[in-house]
């Protein structure tokens, strides 16, 4: 229960623009639970917004290593790859998720975009 509260607190801090405090919250959560996919995903979002792409890739990858079908991390990782003009790298991951969840329109759209990438800076 404590970990859920810490995760929620971090998400509230982030939503209120207190990014550094949110980051500390998520990092402390990982000290208690190194398998918290949500914390890794949230840290990936923070790194992505800070334009620390290497760190963002690392965090999203760690989240997906814990749960390869974690939708939030898949969407965030795909958006990061799009911003780096490397969207085709997401195809295998998106195909797998799309096969398992045929009703997910956002994943289908991301997969279509990955197969027909447009430059990020158009």
What are these regions (language model features)?
Residues 15-16, 49-50, 83, 116-117:
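Register position in tetratricopeptide repeats
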């Amino acid at each position: 229960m404590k970990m859920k509260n810490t995760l929620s607190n971090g998400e509230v801090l982030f939503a209120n623009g207190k990014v550094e405090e949110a980051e500390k919250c998520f990092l402390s959560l990982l000290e208690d639970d190194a398998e918290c996919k949500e914390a890794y995903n949230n840290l990936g979002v923070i790194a992505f917004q800070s334009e620390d792409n290497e760190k963002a890739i690392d965090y999203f990858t760690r989240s997906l290593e814990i749960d390869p079908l974690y939708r939030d991390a898949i969407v965030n990782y795909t958006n990061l790859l799009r911003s780096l003009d490397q969207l085709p790298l997401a195809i295998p991951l998106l195909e797998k998720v799309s096969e398992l969840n045929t009703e997910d329109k956002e994943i289908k759209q991301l997969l279509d975009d990955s197969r027909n990438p447009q430059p990020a800076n158009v």
